[in-house]
Amino acid sequence: MIVDNSKDFDLKSFLANLTTHSGVYRMLDKHGEIIYVGKAKNLKNRVNSYFSKGAKDSKTLMMVEQIARIEITITPSDYEAYLLENNLIKQHRPKYNILFKDDKSYPYLVISRDKFPRVSFYRSKSAYKKGQCFGPYVSISSVKNTLNTIQKIFPIRQCENSYYKSRVRPCLQYQIKCCLAPCVGLVSQQQYDEQLAILKKFLAGKFSSVLEEISAKMYQASEDMEYEKAQVYRDQLVVLRKLQQQQIVDIQEDKTFDVIGIYMQDSYASIALLQIQNGDVVADRHWSIDAKGQDKTSIMHAFLSHFYLGDEIRNIWPKNIILSKVEFADITDLMNSISQKIGQAINWIIAPAADNLKWLKLAEVNARQKLNIYTSSKSQYQKRLESLKEFLELEKDIKRIECFDISHFQGEATIASCVVYTDDGEDRKSHRRYNIKDIKSGDDYAAIHQAVSRRVSSGLEADNLPDVMIIDGGKGQIHQAEAVFREYGIQDKVQLVSLGKGIERISGKEKIYKGFDDTEYTLDEHNPGFLLLRQVRDSAHDHAIKGQRKKVSANRQSSIIEEIEGVGPKRRKALMMYFGGWQELSRASVDEIAKVKGISKKLAQEIWECFH
């Protein structure tokens, strides 16, 4: 809903009565959208500066012209103002703020808050909501390798809670000594917590401390003649020492530091963050942004707030942070707020020398390389957008593209995927899938109609329809989408286009149809607009296939048992309660299956034959 605030907002009176306290201010346009969020020690002076005479960059002048309303929040201190500003920027992503988008989502190891916690990994910064986090790790493979290592050393459960709660006997992990089986009470709370405490030290990098503690426990168990217990500790030491030989070393906090390099070119900027431990780069991360009208200090200020005052999770925070040269006085308050949040003093190094200078130069080289890749990719993508706009004869620039594709398995488990591309590229977080229901087997036309109808309905309600909607298919598919567009009256709001391989089904020779136009179009296979259509279409196809495979896999697992006469819902539930999952059931013998309440030897034989 559009709300014009400019008519009832008295800017002159508002500025005259502003408080001099610290706090956060929000600039809103005539639609009620937040276009900028800032913080200030003195709200009156800071906000008034936007409207006073004096030199301002073009970006600020453009923003001021759009301000229809200003809202403020007073905070108890400058520190709280920084935190609130950071949270509001992440929540609303105002178009005039410097926005950072990490080039990937890093995985974290998480120890849950359950009575008998599990260790798992999450590829999200929201992982901290699940329990105590360790990381981030540089890749999925590195975190999986760590999980495998943990399983060999520490018998802590890794299973899902649903599986854990359904157990009535130990699973295979207990039998191979990779779990203590807390699910069936084979370990005391104290014993489990002891292993958990050692694991936490291990994940925090306290390698020497872990070795010493396990050695002490092994000798103590031996003296107490608890030889089985001593053997467990001995086995842990064997694996740990093997890891030590592979140069896994203790992390020394005083040799742990971050290096932040910035490189700027034209209206773009790139930031490289190197995380150093014991003289080695253990992680490198990059951010590339549009930085028109910004200088190095303002970008560094925005980045430090984004990264260190946000929800970043670190086991060990650095004692030293090395920065590209900026105006130190401008970010002193922010530095103090970061130290306050982290809970330790930080040595900020702005003009490094010797070894520290070497690290800073490395970070700046990384930032430059990343920016070259970013600008090249962005330039190519913008050319494709402009070419597609020209082909579709659109007056406005394309800000959002959505593409639909249908996938099914022999007519069943039908999935519609919708992928999203914006003027910045693929927006994976906005991708979604639709489970298609109540249609005839293999009816792609009905599936497209249902998926597009659901998307248009929700899009009108949320006011977030795309500029261009692509349908994977030919005339039949696009006609279904046209029917939906007519039903909702959006023929002039969204440009409809379809891309199909035609009779020849040759890649690069696809047939293109525009909405409400039966003309068949073809474009040169090297045409930038055509390449974008194919790029988006292929993403939708991959997204649909992945979703459909998951659905088929889930359906198959349950249908195997459903096909056996005499195994109804109650017996299926009993089997799951006893074995905890289809995989465990498939490994069980006939005699083991027959132990389940309500399952005869004959029925157990039939169940066993289903899996063999």
Curated annotation (Swiss-Prot):
CDD domains: GIY-YIG_UvrC_Cho. PROSITE patterns: GIY_YIG, UVR, UVRC. GO terms for molecular function: DNA binding; excinuclease ABC activity. The keyword Cytoplasm applies. Its main location: cytoplasm. GO terms for biological process: nucleotide-excision repair; SOS response. The keyword DNA damage applies. Belongs to the UvrC family. Interacts with UvrB in an incision complex. The UvrABC repair system catalyzes the recognition and processing of DNA lesions. UvrC both incises the 5' and 3' sides of the lesion. The N-terminal half is responsible for the 3' incision and the C-terminal half is responsible for the 5' incision. This is UvrABC system protein C. It comes from Francisella tularensis subsp. tularensis (strain SCHU S4 / Schu 4). The gene is uvrC.
